[in-house]
């Protein structure tokens, strides 16, 4: 709630946008605000709650360990002990998550599945960041990357650092051009990986 208060204060502080400022600029700015990391909030409520708030604020969904239902509404996030709800799966379909928000994932230790589908702000840096996070290197078992136009071979190859990855689906990624090289990289780095390619 406090976050939306801060955002509304910032919005109210805008008296007049320049004439050259179109709606794309405004929404880009707003998405950046939604992705901004509040380290005090992470400290106060824990990494899973803070990451849940970030993901839902940006239009993604989360599912917690021991639950079948996806959390889709920021205002209906469960309350209770901070260590009770651990993120097991993230579905970022059509969300506005971007690299500046990925520090929200630093403390996550139980994420097993990530789906990035039609994420227009996802770039190689996001996948590079995921591959650097020790906790996620251990926990992520499945990942799907679909219709993310800014992802290239460089970002996909960074996924080889997710050492327990068992399943990787890559579909409709126009920036990925060296399919055979990807296959070789993953066969070497993750021999037990099921790699499913639906690329042109």
Swiss-Prot record:
Instruction: Keyword check for Methyltransferase, yes or no.
Output: no
Q: Which domain of life is it from?
A: Eukaryota
The UniProt keyword set, sorted, is: ATP synthesis, CF(0), Hydrogen ion transport, Ion transport, Leucine-rich repeat, Magnesium, Membrane, Metal-binding, Mitochondrion, Mitochondrion inner membrane, Repeat, Transit peptide, Transport
Chief location bin: mitochondrion
UniProt transit peptide range = 1-25
LRR repeat positions in this chain? 62-87, 88-116, 117-141, 142-173
Asked whether the keyword Metal-binding is assigned, the reply is: yes
Q: Which GO terms describe its molecular function?
A: metal ion binding
GO cellular component terms given for this protein: mitochondrial inner membrane; proton-transporting ATP synthase complex
N-terminal domain as annotated region, ranges: 1-61
| Subcellular location(s) of the protein | Mitochondrion; Mitochondrion inner membrane
Instruction: Provide the GO biological process annotations.
Output: ATP biosynthetic process; proton transmembrane transport
Sites binding Mg(2+) sit at 59, 93
Report the function annotation for this chain.
Involved in regulation of mitochondrial membrane ATP synthase. Necessary for H(+) conduction of ATP synthase. Facilitates energy-driven catalysis of ATP synthesis by blocking a proton leak through an alternative proton exit pathway.
Family designation: Belongs to the ATP synthase subunit s family.
Quaternary context: Homotetramer. Associates with ATP synthase.
What protein is this chain from?
Answer: ATP synthase subunit s, mitochondrial
């Amino acid at each position: 709630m406090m976050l939306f208060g801060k955002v509304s204060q910032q919005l109210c502080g805008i008296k007049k946008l320049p004439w050259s400022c179109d709606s794309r600029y405004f929404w880009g700015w707003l998405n950046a605000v939604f992705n901004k990391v509040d380290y005090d909030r992470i400290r106060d409520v824990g990494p899973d709650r803070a990451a849940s708030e970030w993901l839902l604020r940006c239009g993604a969904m989360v599912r917690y360990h021991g639950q079948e239902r996806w959390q889709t509404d920021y205002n209906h996030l469960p309350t209770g002990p901070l260590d009770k709800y651990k993120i097991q799966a993230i579905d970022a379909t059509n969300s506005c998550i971007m690299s500046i928000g990925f520090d929200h994932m630093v403390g996550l230790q139980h994420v097993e599945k990530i789906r990035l589908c039609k994420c227009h702000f996802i770039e190689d840096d996001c996948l590079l960041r995921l591959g650097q996070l020790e906790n996620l290197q251990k926990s992520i078992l499945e990942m799907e990357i679909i219709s993310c136009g800014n992802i290239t071979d460089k970002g996909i190859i960074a996924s080889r650092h997710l050492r327990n990855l068992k399943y990787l689906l890559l579909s409709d990624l126009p920036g990925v051009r060296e399919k055979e090289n990807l296959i070789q990289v993953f066969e070497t780095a993750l021999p037990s990986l099921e790699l499913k390619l639906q690329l042109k």
